[in-house]
Amino acid sequence: MAKDRPDLKNYVGQELTVIAWLWARTVPSPDPSMAGKHVPLIRSFWLSKKKGKEAFVYPVIDKGKGEYRFEVRVGKPNEGFDPDDGTIRRAGGRCLVTGAAMGFPHVRKQGQQGQMKTRQMAVVVEGNRGRVYLDPDASHAAIAEQAVPSWSPSAELPHNPRDFKTPNYGMKTFADLFTPRQLTALVTFSDLVGEARAKVLEDCR
């Protein structure tokens, strides 16, 4: 990875702290040639637009196999690729691999059928002078998929399809808004708040 990324030269051999994993939700492509393979719902491929520190996710597509993978690239994008051109917009979406139109009715139907999943786009680590963006890591993704939260909110979301859109996509409870790994992290943070409170009370005695 570092060979193609001059910005990583100073980090070779170091262990960096992960501060975030970036994911995209996915649904089966509506294109028959994709045979139900999942494609991402992405508003933008940008990771950072800061001048001199531009970074974005570049999709490497193999149309013959109906597959894709994500690479993190830095600097200004090459002509022909616009990171602002995601796969989902107000008017609908498109299949990342084939370009086939993917309307919201299709996305909603897949969500309601429990077919909405996630795919890792990038890993964010703490660098010497700010954030550093790395390619997706299969081992990290595998660990995230094994997460089992000790608790999750079972309360139902408001049923108001006009103003509250998430139930339209199969997300009916507050727990549905988060992935298992996110719920695990939130429960951990909540537990730590309780421990901190107990520590403060103990120190006040």
Predicted regions and their residues:
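Charged, often flexible domain-edge or linker segments that flank or initiate folded functional domains
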Residues: 1-205
